[in-house]
């Protein structure tokens, strides 16, 4: 996607905007200061996605690059049903957030990277340990990614991320986002584990590294439509992103679950429309 020489600038710009939005909320949507993980995810989708695109534009434009970013509020929608490592049928949300970046440099999307993120408030020391039954079910899903199904509003059939042949591993498809409380709600990314340490890449840095050409470990490529990872990302953009959510704690709704912003406005010479990451 983007040369590594631009990563530092993109990371600093994204971290600055995310930190600002998490402190104050998505004020353009009349969100008050968020205090819990759901509110922080909403602030990212509604406020940080367009703010990052605006901050990246003067970095990418002179170099001739263009990317689009989509954030999708997935909290409780959809839920995944799977057989856990103990052989029991379990159900939990697929994640709290999906972030997708598309390379739009040529005017049409040529490559796509995505990551599912489960948000958790960090403990006082900055890390987090998972021990509750619900948390362990979610961890089992994100650690092993067994075959799972989604509700009837999605195309039928089991989904198995092992069908993805792109570089990286199934573990790269998901990360935990550990968010520190106000007044400095820093958001750090951690690989799924029962005990996650403090620190790690800030979310903006993680997203900037997703754009690096040839990288692994920061999300996973989802360019195709024939493997279950790419298909699931596409389905979330076509189904979940088109629905609305309400959140009573400081955010009047409803609001769209999906929000897309382009870091460099490009002209499509064919005159067709850009819809959910694809020219139609």
Language model regions located:
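Acidic, metal/cofactor-coordinating or nucleic-acid-engaging core segments within structured domains
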Residues: 49-62, 110, 122-280
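Beta-propeller blade termini
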Residues: 100-102
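Short, solvent-exposed loop/turn segments that connect beta-strands within catalytic domains
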Residues: 104-112
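Soluble secreted/lumenal catalytic domains
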Residues: 3-21
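Conserved catalytic cores of phosphodiester-cleaving nucleases, focusing on short active-site segments
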Residues: 97, 115-121
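Acidic-basic catalytic patches of nuclease active cores, encompassing PD-(D/E)XK
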Residues: 15-83
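Short, solvent-exposed beta-strand/turn "edge" segments of beta-rich domains on protein surfaces
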Residues: 84-90
């Amino acid at each position: 996607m983007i040369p590594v020489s631009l990563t530092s600038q993109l990371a600093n710009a994204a971290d600055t905007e995310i930190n600002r939005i998490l402190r104050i909320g998505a004020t353009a949507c009349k969100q008050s200061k968020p205090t819990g993980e759901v509110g922080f995810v909403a602030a990212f989708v509604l406020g940080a996605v367009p703010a990052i695109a605006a901050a990246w534009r003067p970095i990418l434009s002179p170099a001739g690059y263009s990317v689009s970013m989509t954030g999708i509020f997935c909290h409780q929608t959809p839920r995944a049903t799977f057989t856990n490592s103990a052989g029991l049928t379990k159900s939990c949300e697929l994640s709290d957030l999906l972030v997708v970046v598309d390379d739009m440099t040529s005017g049409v999307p040529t490559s796509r990277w995505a990551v599912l993120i489960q948000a958790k408030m960090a403990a006082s020391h900055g890390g987090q340990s998972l021990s509750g039954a619900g948390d362990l079910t979610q961890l089992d899903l994100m650690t092993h990614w067994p075959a799972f199904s989604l509700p009837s509003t999605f195309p039928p059939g089991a989904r198995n991320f092992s069908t993805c042949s792109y570089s990286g591993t199934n573990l790269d498809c998901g990360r935990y986002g550990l968010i520190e409380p106000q007044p400095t709600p820093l958001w750090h990314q951690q690989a799924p584990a029962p005990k996650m340490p403090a620190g790690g890449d800030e979310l903006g840095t993680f997203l900037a590294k997703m754009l690096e050409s040839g990288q692994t470990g920061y999300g996973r490529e989802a360019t195709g439509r024939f493997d279950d990872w790419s298909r699931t990302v596409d389905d979330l953009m076509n189904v979940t992103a088109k629905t609305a959510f309400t959140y009573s704690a400081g955010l009047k709704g409803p609001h769209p679950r999906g929000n897309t912003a382009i870091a460099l406005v490009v002209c499509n010479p064919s005159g067709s429309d850009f819809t959910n990451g694809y020219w139609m």
